[in-house]
Amino acid sequence: MTKEQLGVLILDCERQLYSTAKTILYSDQDCADAIQDTIVKAFSKIQTLKNDNYARTWLIRILINECYTILRKSSKLTSLDMMDEQTKAEKIMMTKEKADYSELYQAINALKEEVRLPVILYYIEDFNIREIAQILDITEGAVQKRLARARGKLRCNLRESEAAI
């Protein structure tokens, strides 16, 4: 794959990159940082891509790793005082953002990351089971189990919220 082809792929996957980063990081600034780091790393490591057919999967895997790197760094840097202030600010922002989200999207975001990420990749980003397994470095059976677990949890949560109304 050439650098020009990678550039086109990145532009085509822009929305997917953002929504995948958002499922892990939540903060728009952190998402932008992760995407930027992903693009830099992808261009610098393009020679490690063995099969052009898996370029999108490879790019998403790099993004997920970058998101986890940001999470690790931020957990080391945040002091307790800053965490209290940050938590308050995030709660206010999340409340405003959640008002814009549909009930289903809120239910998806409430899932544990282990099952949320496969749901986003499968139902929103249109990755197939095999690609998700490669991205998350798990078996296809594990992806299917996580999707089934997520569907069950979503079904239960949405029924509970309907009953509350």
List PLM regions with ranges:
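A short pre-motif secondary-structure segment
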Residues: 118-122
